[in-house]
């Protein structure tokens, strides 16, 4: 049995794991929300132009919503891969998938240039994004959680979640800056800039993850030979109740989150008459507040329990959802 790491070295390793988890998660969700914001503002005009504006917007959102069906597949697929080959290698794969698809979306010709192939290719690349984010989300959480000290699991587990809102903040900021261009320039090339420049962020994330070691839990399982051949099937067979409960808990908070983070932009601009900048600024403020509060709630869950924190926040958010 190997000797435990010295305390200072262990703390340094944990910090590196948290940085890798947060950075990769932020980059992947930056890519993810770029698509959502672009779907709200430009995709209906560039990839579905032959439809009524409302129908075109619905089709753009439909392409965005595809990931809700693809992400579980990506989650199951990369959970299996992660349990077989390790967390680090799996997270490199998911980040590469997400980043590559995002850059290619920024390079896509529009309907005006290649006709029906434009929306088809857009949807295919969105499917690839869905597979990548499905694997990234669970993998980043697992990476942080398996490195966490026993009494700080909530705080460590909250760090990748900050990547969601931080990615949304950065994506909205990027589109907001480009939306300051004249409308014709924004539609012609401005919206593409954040997609293409995201390649730099992806390489940064890959570099950070390349220097990360495997988690202690995975190395211990591999050394003992206790690595399941079919981990997903065993999980569904032995822990199906827990899986269903976790999925249900996630649905309750995920549905309103996406309404307030993506749909609200087009609704504010097209139905309420707000300027694009005002709608995007509102989303950015919400993302900033969430980014600051998420680790606080993770810390609090270590003090008073996960159930109390979750149920309290669900009750607090209920009046807002009914008003929306």
Protein language model regions, located:
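Glycine-rich segments within core transmembrane alpha-helices of 12-TM secondary carriers
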Residues: 155-176
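Cytoplasmic membrane-interface "Motif A"-like loop-to-helix N-cap segments
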Residues: 84-95, 303-313
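Hydrophobic core of transmembrane alpha-helices in multi-pass small-molecule transporters
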Residues: 115-133
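Extracytoplasmic gate region of multi-pass secondary transporters
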Residues: 36, 241-286
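Residue-level detector of conserved catalytic or cofactor/ligand-binding positions
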Residues: 312-320, 324
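Extracellular/periplasmic helix-loop-helix junction of adjacent transmembrane segments
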Residues: 40-71
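Flexible cytoplasmic inter-helical loops of multi-pass small-molecule transporters
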Residues: 210-231
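Central cavity-lining transmembrane alpha-helices of secondary-active solute carriers
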Residues: 62-80, 101, 284-296
